[in-house]
């Protein structure tokens, strides 16, 4: 991560040993629910509303039904157009890093199970459906290491398989921070680049790791070849790759290695910050060489989210996503973080073409750790405090729940236009079952009576300033 700004029981099919746990409390304020479907997939003759306010007094709160009307008095603030269809959307997520797994394993089995249900089970909590998983050592692993089968058995793997059990639609994308030290110019996991003569061996290493996870019951669906290839971290595993190295590695080595292994995975290029989009553009510039690339993955720490649109416009048919975006101490309170997530991630990234959105650590402690030499002020989607036994959701947790709980993986982004000058940010989805999800953020300084028109019908809702709302019908 380059922020230069700013067992439990055995896994289903082994890659766990029981871990000692301490008594703690789960203090996540999420209503209990036994449904196995996402809220947005329930067809209804009326609209339902869920709201998170800027003060945090309401957090993904069910505000009950909102009636449709056929009246047309006044100009609508938002028009939802089912006929305008854009990219498929596969969900929101995070990363179960080594730090996250160790912290979650301090929880008693029943508490940890409830936390996992509230995070991953469709229709309950926030409905994460994507995990971007570090492959080997990274800035939030317990140490620097190269992947070997069995290395993740104690902590990470059992949580991955539990998440997959809770959500059968879960998709995992693997991302390495470094090639094994023996394949690098530095002879170390820290620093250096990939030796050209070891590109084939590295590709086989990646394919072997993906196969090992799949055999252990982890639903691996995608792969990047290098986390932040433009950045060489000084104190933890990392590796630089220039554009030509990435292109050659993807096309000539990784794609063939996956094919030989019988693996059909999406290959994601870049896996770096928004401001590196010209690198992705150059990587994709030769049509004959871009065939191996399914999409381009971005991080949020530098540059602007419009980078996704730059790639979509220049390279039609290439998917884009946000594969890492940490919260941290730089956020100025609940309202500030909620606004960022709503405007930049949930609305901004999706309207610019994102197929999925991922935060960074699923869980960290109150000090932003444990770390392995990287970011010292990051924050997890939830904060686990082993000393007090509390698990506290972040504002980003609730923000991501406004999409994850209601949008089914494979949904289609559809037209949603806010009236000019309305201070409303919005994005809409149509689920595979035909139900609709509308996400609206009021970026104004006062409460708004929001009028929404869709399919010849209208509904209205009084939305406080700085509030995020999800409407389903």
Task: Label each PLM-derived region with a short phrase.
Residues 33-222, 231, 247-281, 285-292, ...:
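Non-catalytic accessory regions flanking glycosidase/transglycosidase catalytic cores in CAZymes
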Residues 292-302, 331-346:
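Extracellular glycoside hydrolase catalytic/binding regions
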Residues 321-323:
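Active-site neighborhood of phospho(di)ester-bond hydrolases with catalytic His/Asp-centered motifs
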Residues 2-39:
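Secretory targeting and sorting signals
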Residues 342-345, 373-385:
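Acidic, Ser/Thr-rich peripheral helices and adjacent loops at domain boundaries
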Residues 226:
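Function-critical acidic carboxylates
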Residues 327-330, 365-366:
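Short gly/pro/ser/thr-enriched loop/turn and capping motifs at secondary-structure boundaries
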Residues 106-107, 237-238, 333-336:
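Short, solvent-exposed loop/turn segments at secondary-structure boundaries
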């Amino acid at each position: 991560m380059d922020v230069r700004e700013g067992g439990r029981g055995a896994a289903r099919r082994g890659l766990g040993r029981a871990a000692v746990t301490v008594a703690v409390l789960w203090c996540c304020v999420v209503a209990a629910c036994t449904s196995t479907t996402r809220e947005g997939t329930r067809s209804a003759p009326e609209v339902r509303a869920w709201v998170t306010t800027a003060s945090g007094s309401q957090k993904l709160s069910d505000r009950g039904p909102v009636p449709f009307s056929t009246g047309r008095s006044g100009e609508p603030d938002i028009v939802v157009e089912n006929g305008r269809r854009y990219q498929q959307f596969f969900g929101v997520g995070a990363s179960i890093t080594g730090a996250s797994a160790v912290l979650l394993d301090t929880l008693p089995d029943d508490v940890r199970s409830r936390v996992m249900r509230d995070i991953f089970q469709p229709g309950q909590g926030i409905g994460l459906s994507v995990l971007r998983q570090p492959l080997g050592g990274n800035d939030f692993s317990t140490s620097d290491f190269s992947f070997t089968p069995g290395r993740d058995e104690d902590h990470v793997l059992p949580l991955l398989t539990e998440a997959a059990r809770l959500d059968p639609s879960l998709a995992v994308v693997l991302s390495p921070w470094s090639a094994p030290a023996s394949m690098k110019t530095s002879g170390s996991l820290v620093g250096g680049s990939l030796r050209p003569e070891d590109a084939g061996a590295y590709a086989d290493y990646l394919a072997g790791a993906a196969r090992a996870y799949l055999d252990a019951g982890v639903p691996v669906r995608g792969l990047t070849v290098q986390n932040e290839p433009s950045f060489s971290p000084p104190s933890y595993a990392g590796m630089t790759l220039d554009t030509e190295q990435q292109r050659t590695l993807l096309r000539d080595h990784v794609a063939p290695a996956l094919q030989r292994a019988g693996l059909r995975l999406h290959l994601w290029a870049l896996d770096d910050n928004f401001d590196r989009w010209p690198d992705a553009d150059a990587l994709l510039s030769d049509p004959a060489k871009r065939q191996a690339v399914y999409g381009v993955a971005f991080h949020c720490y530098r540059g602007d989210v419009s980078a996704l649109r730059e790639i979509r416009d220049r390279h039609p048919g290439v998917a884009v996503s946000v594969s890492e975006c940490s919260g941290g101490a730089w956020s100025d309170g609940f309202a500030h973080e909620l606004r960022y997530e709503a405007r930049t991630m949930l609305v901004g990234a999706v309207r610019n073409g994102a197929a999925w959105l991922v935060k960074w650590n699923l869980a960290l402690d109150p000090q932003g750790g444990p770390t392995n030499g990287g970011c010292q002020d990051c924050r997890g989607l939830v904060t686990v405090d082993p000393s007090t036994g509390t698990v506290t959701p972040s504002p980003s947790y609730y923000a991501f729940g406004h999409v994850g709980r209601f949008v089914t993986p494979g949904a289609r982004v559809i037209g949603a236009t806010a009236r000019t000058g309305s201070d409303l940010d919005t994005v809409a989805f149509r689920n595979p079952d035909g139900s609709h999800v509308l996400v609206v953020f009021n970026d104004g300084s006062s409460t708004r009576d929001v009028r929404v028109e869709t399919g010849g019908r209208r509904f209205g809702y009084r939305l406080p300033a700085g509030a995020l709302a999800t409407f389903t019908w």
